[in-house]
Amino acid sequence: MTIGHLVSVSKEHEMVNPIFADFIAGASARYAQSGYDLLHSLVPDEDEFTSYKELAARSAVDGVVVHAPRVDEQRIAQLNNLNLPFVVHGRSSNTVEKYNWVDVNNERSFFRATQLLIELGHRSIGLINGVAEMDFAMRRTRGYRRALKENNIAVAEAYITHSEMTEPNGYKNAITLLDLPTPPTAIVTSSIIMANGIRRALDERELKLGRDVSVITHDDDLSYFRDPAAVPVYTATRSSVREAGRLSADLLLKTIADPGRDPEGILLDAELILGSSTKPPRPR
């Protein structure tokens, strides 16, 4: 008995991404308890659906987990047509199909993060986000924009960047924002990995995290980056991706055991954890 996790070649780096690794750690513990093996497969982007069809035809897997869903996600309808049990880690906003999913409330998380910065007195707030086509990134942008709108703050499009969530991209995008004629006094970012890149950019410009530029990050509670300090370095919206892996596995195993059950969605709320990276803006 086997559960499949297919990763496209364009997302090959995800195989060593600590977010993916922690998700797999949570899921695989559940698989092992239920007697299932885990299959990782790296496939060309254009052959991803073909790979699903071949796995289903050969009965090579009992179910699959879909990673990194886009706003417009074709894999969901394709898998429903194959009658192959699956669960999506995340959601796809433009998909009308019914499907199993586990997701964090991304819009609410980034609304709360932006609202906190506004309450501290910030009016120039940047957003360093994930790839725009990804559903989580779209929802986080929506939460950020909604907080600004509800506080009558104009959205500065130059303050919004999208890229893959790596440390170098966090650094590069932070430099772009810091080089603006009126740089933001605060930044919200989608990953603690990117936050570390932002911090490197601040250090390079001899700016102090929190004092000169406030930063709030989304924190997937990664085992590799866990902060044991009484006051964390970063103020963060925190939701355990390992727990998301466990819940995704539970939901998939239920569906395998009872293929006729109605699809289910699980929405997780992120905690807002106060750290030392957020303070009122300094007078300019």
Each PLM stretch: what is its role?
Residues 2, 85, 124, 185-186:
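Residues that mark the start of a beta-strand
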Residues 9-21, 40-49, 102-112, 128-173, ...:
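Hinge/beta->alpha junction and helix N-cap segments in small-molecule ligand-binding domains
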Residues 61-67, 126-128, 160, 181-191, ...:
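Periplasmic-binding protein-like
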Residues 123, 154-156, 208:
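Conserved H-loop
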